[in-house]
Each structure stands twice: as structure tokens, then as C-alpha cells.
Amino acid sequence: MTWKLGDEEPASNGGRGTDDALTVTRILEASDIPCCLVGISALIFYGAARLRPDWEIAIPTELIGKAAQLLQSEPHSANYSLVEPWPEPSMSLLHTYHRFKGKGTNFYFILVPAQDVHIVCEPSNITRSLRGLPYPKLSVFIQSCLDTRNELQLCDVVDGTDLPEEWGEENLQLEGFNDVEWAKDINKRGCEFENGKFAHWSPFAWDAPKSRREMWQSKVRTKKDRLDWTKPDHVYITQYRIIGDPDPWTILSDDY
């Protein structure tokens, strides 16, 4: 069941907005703007049970202005409007980005500079859901979690995919540490945005070094520890995966 909010229609796919997001990505790609869905959307694609308020669409940083202008120009301005930025504190710069809303619906999306999620947004790094939505390849997404020291996302994608430890040794760059200089830049920009208006929300990224391999090992070795009495280990293999279930990204879903 979907609920109508005042005069607004629910987003597509029972309020999820999945086909709405697909339309936006196709508009961008038709104008030679590569893109991929990141943040909570990527976590859902890779099996995590998360609630998604807004769709985060990563775009090459140098093309953000072009994308924002495209969506505010005819004919697309008839369907989308620029709205107030993301209103809540978060370990990110979401509050500094272009945020759009589907006119007459409760579909929201945010244009995210790819450098701010430590992803190179190019076709070779992108895979697609069965609906055709673009997502970062699994190795690309997990590498970004390690490089940005986003251990919450890392935990969720590990539990959504149930990857073994050796997968990381074969597919990830585990030597060294998270990108401290990247984090310092994120924190600097977050604190300076609008003359320091949001500085009290800091930090926006963790800028202390931590071993990539240590982060990876600590999450893949503790999957069972994150089960509780509601998810017994004779039914669940991780907090998000039931034993024997197919990989979520291999099935057609209204969520992705």
C-alpha cells in the first residue's frame, strides 16, 4: 500500500522512487554525464536493510554544475525543482549539495560530487541492477568505504554481501591507511560552508589514520557477532542474509 501526502503522489515503486531514480540517471547519461547511485542506495543494492530518505547520485565532480543546470532547464524543469539542502547532521557533506524533488511527488535526490565519496565515476567502475540503475561495482564501493574510513557503510556492505575475508585480499587495496588528506579536505569544506554555519556538525569525516586491512578483517571476522536473538544463526548467515538466499543484486527488485 502507498500513501498520498496531501496533494503529492507517492514516488514510483510503491514510494521507493526506484524508477524515478532510473529516469534521472538516464537523463544524465544522455547528456554524457556518467553517474552511479551511492550511499544508502548502494547499501540496499548490496543487501543491507536500510531506509532511504533521498537517492544519492554520484557524478564526476567537474560535471556537477552541468548536471544541476540540466535538471533546472527545459524540458526537465517541468519535472524537477531545486529544494532546500539536506537538513540533518551527517558524517558527510550532504548539506552542501544540490538537492532536487520530483514535482508533485515525494521523490528526492541529491547530486554528490564523486570525489567526496572517493569514487572515480566512470563506466569501467559501474555495474547495473536488473532494472538498469547504475551502481559502483562491489570492489569499487567497498574500496571507497575503506579509503574514507566509513566503517558503518563497510559493516553494512559486508553483512549484505556475506563476503569472505579472502575476497578482500584478492579484490581490494588493503595496504596502507584510509585517505587522511581527503578527510581533512572534507572537514575543512564542511566547516567553512556558508561562513561556518554548519561547523558544529563536524566532524564530517574521520581524519585519523587506520589500517585498511584492519578495518576489513575486523568487519568480516565479526559477522556472526552482529546476530541477535531475533536472527538465530540456524536461519541467518549475517544480520541481513538468510541462509541459502540468492545475492540480492542478482534478482529484480522494486528497491533497486
Task: Explain the meaning of each model-derived region.
Residues 6-21, 59-97:
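Metal-dependent nucleotidyltransferase catalytic core
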Residues 90-256:
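Catalytic cores of NTP-dependent nucleotidyl/adenyl transfer enzymes across multiple folds
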